[in-house]
């Protein structure tokens, strides 16, 4: 059987489970009203759209989405934008809130518990392979290639991994591997002595939060883990170390299945779990030749499509045209005679006359009043920025009125603006 046909048969035997219940506390006020996977990204998408689009483009069309923390925004997005799969062809996206399977007091206690609480649903669909995905990373990956790698290897678990500098290892689950890619050790966020990639001294393999299991093996692991009172019921801390100890874990480097892939192509994967990382990944898209190609017709990023008129850029009342460079603007935006550079504007943003906006991420339904100056600002949905406001130039004022990171990125929310107006 050739590789194409082999992959075709395999993805029919697989089901994906997207873990989308996390708060993402390091995003601070951006997740006050929504789960991290529901946070806006890239001018028109939500973060979860990337994992779901990877599933569809890879042929994986049996998908469960596990939700918990402040899930209304996420559920509404999935219902509006992801209801096009055809049930009569055994295609679906199941929305899976916490089942309180263990008892009536506990919601999901960890990533492994989130899967365990849906074990009956998984079994009812009868997949041979279960693909467990984090719903909060930005990347493009062909899961069918990883699935084929897993099936051909003979291992019972395969872990997706991305190459990082050793100096960044403290923030990730790091794996040691042998020359055949068998995982020999797995350490969650090591502070020192992180295992390096064979043949290097300064590069490590970090877990991407992507796992493929033989389904029966996964069920056995989860049922054993749930009875362990010492367990935190987490894949990275408990399940994967157990699999490694049983010599059943294979490492799958992201470079083997990233989209696009090939010589000289740097795989693009971003954990947007902090305000700085979120801001940087959004601004990546404003580059002349962005590393992440959202214009690829062969691997589209799907999302909910609100029916809106095109963005419009017009002179102000004095005839000043303004200048817009390296900026993405979604439908329904209107900009009057302002200067905007290297920024992203989500749908229905209004920028009034005389503004100067640089390196900003502006979420839907924001109004920026006349003569504002904004630099390195992330503005949450629905903010009404008063005329003449300056953000991003005075670190002391920014830290007093808003949330400012050590790198100088300022987060502005509707609540912050409302409180400022009351002073």
From Swiss-Prot:
Transmembrane segments: none annotated. Its EC number is 2.7.7.27. It catalyses: alpha-D-glucose 1-phosphate + ATP + H(+) = ADP-alpha-D-glucose + diphosphate. Alpha-D-glucose 1-phosphate binds at residues 108, 173, 188-189, 207. Pathway: Glycan biosynthesis; glycogen biosynthesis. It holds the Pfam family NTP_transferase. SUPFAM superfamilies: Nucleotide-diphospho-sugar transferases, Trimeric LpxA-like enzymes. InterPro entries: ADP-Glc_PPase, ADP_Glu_pyroP_CS, GlgC_bac, GlmU/GlgC-like_hexapep, NTP_transferase_dom, Nucleotide-diphossugar_trans, Trimer_LpxA-like_sf. One of its GO terms (molecular function) is glucose-1-phosphate adenylyltransferase activity. One of its GO terms (biological process) is glycogen biosynthetic process. Keywords: ATP-binding, Carbohydrate metabolism, Glycogen biosynthesis, Glycogen metabolism, Nucleotide-binding, Nucleotidyltransferase, Transferase. Gene3D superfamilies: Hexapeptide repeat proteins, Spore Coat Polysaccharide Biosynthesis Protein SpsA, Chain A. Signal peptide: none annotated. Belongs to the bacterial/plant glucose-1-phosphate adenylyltransferase family. Homotetramer. This is Glucose-1-phosphate adenylyltransferase.
């Amino acid at each position: 059987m050739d590789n194409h046909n082999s992959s075709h048969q395999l993805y029919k035997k697989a089901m994906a489970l997207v873990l989308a219940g996390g708060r993402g506390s390091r995003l601070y006020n951006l997740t006050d009203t929504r789960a991290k996977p529901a946070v806006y990204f890239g001018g028109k998408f939500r973060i979860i759209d990337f994992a779901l689009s990877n599933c569809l483009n890879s042929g994986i069309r049996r998908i469960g989405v596990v939700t918990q923390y402040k899930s209304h925004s996420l559920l509404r997005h999935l219902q509006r934008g992801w209801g096009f799969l055809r049930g009569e062809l055994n295609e679906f996206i199941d929305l899976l809130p916490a089942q309180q399977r263990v008892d009536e007091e506990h919601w999901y206690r960890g990533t492994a518990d989130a899967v365990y609480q849906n074990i009956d649903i998984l079994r009812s669909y009868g997949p041979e392979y279960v693909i467990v995905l984090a719903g909060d990373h930005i990347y493009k990956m062909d899961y069918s290639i990883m699935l084929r790698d897993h099936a051909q290897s003979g291992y019972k678990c395969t872990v997706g991994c991305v190459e990082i500098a050793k100096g960044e290892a403290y923030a990730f689950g790091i794996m040691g591997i042998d020359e055949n890619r068998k995982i020999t050790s797995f350490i969650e966020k090591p502070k020192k002595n992180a295992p390096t990639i064979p043949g290097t001294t300064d590069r490590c393999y970090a877990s991407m939060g992507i796992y493929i299991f033989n389904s029966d093996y996964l069920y056995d692991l989860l049922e054993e883990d749930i009875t362990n009172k010492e367990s935190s019921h987490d894949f990275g801390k408990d399940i994967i170390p157990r699999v490694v100890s049983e010599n059943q874990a294979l490492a799958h480097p992201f470079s083997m299945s990233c989209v696009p892939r090939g010589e000289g192509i740097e795989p693009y994967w971003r954990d947007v779990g902090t305000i700085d990382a979120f801001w940087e990944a959004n601004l990546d898209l404003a580059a002349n030749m962005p590393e992440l190609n959202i214009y690829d017709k062969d691997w589209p990023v799907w999302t909910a499509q609100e029916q809106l008129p095109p963005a419009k850029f017009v002179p102000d009342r004095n005839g000043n045209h303004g200048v817009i460079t390296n900026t993405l603007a979604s439908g329904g935006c209107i900009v009057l005679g302002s200067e905007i550079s290297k920024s992203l504007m989500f749908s229905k943003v209004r920028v009034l006359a005389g503004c100067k906006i640089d390196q900003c991420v502006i979420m839907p339904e924001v109004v920026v009043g006349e003569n504002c100056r904004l630099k390195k600002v992330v503005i949450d949905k629905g903010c009404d920025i008063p005329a003449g406001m300056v953000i991003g130039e005075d670190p002391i004022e920014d830290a007093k009125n808003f949330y400012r990171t050590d790198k100088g990125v300022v987060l502005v929310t509707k609540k912050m603006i409302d409180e400022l107006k009351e002073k």
